[in-house]
Amino acid sequence: MKKILVLGAGRSAVTLIKYLLENSISNNWQVTVADFSIELAERAVANHENGKAIFFNVTDEIQRKSEIENADIVISMLPASLHITVAKDCVSLVKNMVTASYVSPEIADLDEKAKQAGVLLLNEIGLDPGIDHMSAMQVIDEIKENGGDLTSFKSFCGGLVHPDYDNNPWNYKFTWNPRNVVLAGQGTAQYIKQGNYKYIPYTKLFERTELMEVLDAGEFEGYANRDSLGYRYAYGLEDIPTLFRGTLRRKGYCKAWNMFVQLGMTDDTYEVENSENLTYRAFINLFFPYNNELSVEQKFCSYLNLSQDSEEFSKIEWLGIFTDTIVGLKDATPAKILQKICEEKWTLDSEDKDMIVMQHQFEYVQNGEQKKLNSSLLVFGDDPRYTSMAKTVGLPVAIAAKLILTGKIKSTGVKIPTTKNIYIPVLKELEDNGINFVEELV
């Protein structure tokens, strides 16, 4: 019986664990789910005959090494900063490891040791990164093999609320880590356009958006991700003139969110004095010049050059930020207070479903002819637990683990899924599970 160790039973792991347990009998697997919260682990295992839930403390070296040594493969769904600790043990104990997270410099440094040990450390095989890599590389390789020369590659992804449950003026609800949403875009975005390097500072990021339609899901806007440039090398596009990666939101979101950015309310570098006793109204008032003649609403509109009947103002007002609700968070940064305000309005309700939207836009020359191809993905969640986000992060990880255990992926070292031996079988099984791209010449 092959033993699979899953570290972490949080939101991103539920579909992954469900897949492993459902396939455990036919594949003769034992699945151990380890989490600091035994309740989370037990809920994920759900008394399955081939599942086991255990309390796990990643900082307990004796327990960590013991559990890894007993496994045939390790799947780490822990916070990204903890992967390196697990990865070092996997190399020394000769165990393959799979994660959905970006390759950190520390993980990258293990490449040679992993190769010497005959160990595969497969990373970036979730949604973004993960499905984006695999689906992009499949098209890129096909274009190159058919004699095409890529001139532009743009890629966008977003986690949003399902259209049937899109019932607020922002057309947005949290489907993933709320903190990441509030802090999104901080730092300068970098990309390349027609051979020219371009930079967008954070204060301009949400003003510089691209509009697009994705299949029958309607209109979206995309803002730039922090670093698109590294993907030239990851995808073998070193000489491509245009490369851009972005995040998708519904039209109108970015203009309204930019109000918070301009006021400084997404700042996470300092704590607000007496934050726990402030009202939301007093909190937003902190960011305006002193004026005891204007209302907070009037200051907001005056400072940001808006009218009170604008869409941006109505979105901000709907969040309840002008009310006398107490913040109730001690020693909180502006970003943490804003997160709390948003969570009260943007949390998925008990019946809500989410949606993943991804689109790759390729431009290339083939036989002297300029061509454009869009490759688009829509995935819908089942409920607030088995979300489209959990599906698209967890299923590629689970499928890759199965392919490694069955000897169909034989690589060693630190890898991401940009090669055919990985992306072809993973994408095939994702398609069997309803996660498939639609290609359109435009």
Q: Model-flagged regions — what are they?
A:
Residues 4-8:
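Conserved N-terminal Rossmann-fold NAD(P)-binding element of oxidoreductases
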Residues 13-14:
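N-terminal Rossmann-fold NAD(P) dinucleotide-binding loop
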Residues 101-123:
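Rossmann-fold NAD(P)-binding glycine/threonine-rich loop
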Residues 133-149:
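Oxidoreductase and adenylate-handling cofactor-binding alpha/beta cores
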Residues 145-442:
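C-terminal catalytic/substrate-binding lobe primarily of soluble NAD(P)-dependent oxidoreductases
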